[in-house]
UniProtKB/Swiss-Prot annotation:
Catalyzes the N-acylation of UDP-3-O-acylglucosamine using 3-hydroxyacyl-ACP as the acyl donor. Is involved in the biosynthesis of lipid A, a phosphorylated glycolipid that anchors the lipopolysaccharide to the outer membrane of the cell. It is an enzyme of class 2 (transferase). It comes from the Bacteria. One of its GO terms (biological process) is lipid A biosynthetic process. Its EC number is 2.3.1.191. One of its GO terms (molecular function) is N-acyltransferase activity. It catalyses: a UDP-3-O-[(3R)-3-hydroxyacyl]-alpha-D-glucosamine + a (3R)-hydroxyacyl-[ACP] = a UDP-2-N,3-O-bis[(3R)-3-hydroxyacyl]-alpha-D-glucosamine + holo-[ACP] + H(+). GO terms for cellular component: membrane. This is UDP-3-O-acylglucosamine N-acyltransferase. Homotrimer. The keyword Lipid metabolism applies.
Length: 346
């Protein structure tokens, strides 16, 4: 499928600088641009590539001013990255979609399947489960008994939704993710640890995306809730009875212990760890590998273990580099003080 600069500009409400009849049929990174490809520039670090790229069309921010000749046709927009996302979504939507239930899939007789659903070979849909319209379920994905999957969802290969859990509309579950496994609940006894049955569920609201091999545990009682618009990277662990606020994003290997409430629009870097039974406010940013032992107020931007403000963290990091020299200096000072004490006592 081919589109002209004029058509693209109309769709994303952009201003054309160059040939409005330039056409593209594919996407490419700006440093790997080829004729017939559309690319984008949003990070200033990549600016040099715009003068040498072979891409036919490049999306740029409105404030971009070329310092030399640019051969590509430019389309100026408010946000080049956001406009690229719109085009990529349009591109995905234009792809032909399969529908129907493959004869090698297992679908329970009591399951309810919506319109234009595709269920791939070896997928499994349990008793009384529900699958909404236009949802795609890839090979070896499993929807447990009584679980409900909304409309326009994608369950990639080997993803698992346990019994009775709820997945909203427009959700994406990547390969190997597990929704609704038992929470890590055990009661200590003199004979060992006794398992506490986890009788709750997991609720994913609309527009949630869950990365590959990410696990969201079912509640002991009630529900573990992932609110609308949350995006979880690969290998994230959400424990039982957690609640994640709308539009919060978490990078790989974040781990959140049980019964913690995370606010809206938070951003957690990779390997952030948060203790249980805490409350994290709205719009909290945590740098990579931060360890959180206590509550955090809204609007905080922290990093480290325990987490501290960025300026304080960078100051501490500078001091940390000097610790070996400071230790030697401290030993020498102690030695000098002892020598002075001995002289004074004579």
């Amino acid at each position: 499928m081919e589109f002209s600069a004029k058509q693209i500009a109309a769709f994303i409400q952009g201003e054309i600088i160059g040939d409005e009849n330039a056409t593209v049929h594919t996407f490419a990174k700006i440093e790997e641009g080829i004729p017939g490809a559309i690319s984008f520039l949003s990070n200033p670090k990549y600016t040099p590539y715009i003068y040498e790229t072979k891409a036919s069309i490049v999306l740029v921010n409105k404030d971009f001013t070329p310092e030399q000749e640019v051969k590509a046709t430019l389309i100026k927009v408010d946000n080049a990255y956001e406009s690229l996302a719109k085009l990529l979504n349009l591109y995905e939507m234009s792809k032909p979609k399969r529908t129907g239930i493959d004869e090698r899939a297992y679908v329970a007789e009591t399951a309810k399947i919506g319109k234009d659903v595709y269920i791939a070979p070896f997928a499994c849909i349990g008793d009384h489960a529900e699958v909404g319209d236009n949802t795609v379920i890839h090979p070896h994905a499993t929807v447990g008994g009584g679980a409900k999957i909304g409309s326009n969802c994608i369950l990639y290969a080997n993803s698992t939704v346990y019994h009775d859990c709820r997945v909203g509309n427009n959700c994406i579950l990547h390969a190997g993710c597990v929704i609704g496994a038992d929470g890590f609940g055990f009661a200590p006894t003199p004979q060992g640890y006794e398992k506490i049955p986890q009788i709750g569920i997991v609720i994913l609201e609309d527009n949630v995306e869950v990365g590959a091999n990410t696990c969201i545990d079912r509640a002991t009682m009630g529900a573990t809730v992932i609110h609308s618009g949350v995006k979880l990277d690969n290998l994230v662990q959400i424990a039982h009875n957690d609640e994640i606020g709308s539009h919060t994003v978490m990078a790989a290997q974040v781990g959140i212990a049980g019964s913690t409430k995370v606010g809206e629009w938070c951003m957690f870097g990779g390997q952030v760890g948060i203790a249980g039974h805490l409350k994290i406010g709205n719009q909290v940013n945590l740098g990579a590998q931060s360890g959180v032992p206590g509550n955090i107020k809204s609007g905080s931007q922290l990093i480290g273990t325990p987490p501290m403000e960025l300026k304080q963290f960078f100051k501490a990091s500078i001091v940390q580099k000097s610790l070996p020299e400071m230790q030697i200096e401290l030993r020498n000072l102690r030695k000098e003080i002892e020598e002075l004490k001995q002289q004074l006592n004579k």
